[in-house]
Amino acid sequence: MKIRASVRKICDKCRLIRRRGRIIVICSNPRHKQRQG
């Protein structure tokens, strides 16, 4: 899980989700997991 100021999709399978007011990227590739800090 990377915490970043700006999250973006890295590949086609990345999905942007809003959870508890935070933007999260989930993907089948675990390296692409991100959260907005």
Swiss-Prot record:
Pfam families: Ribosomal_L36. Disulfide bonds: none annotated. GO terms for cellular component: chloroplast; ribonucleoprotein complex; ribosome. It is found in: Plastid, Chloroplast. The keyword Plastid applies. The keyword Repressor does not apply. This is Large ribosomal subunit protein bL36c.
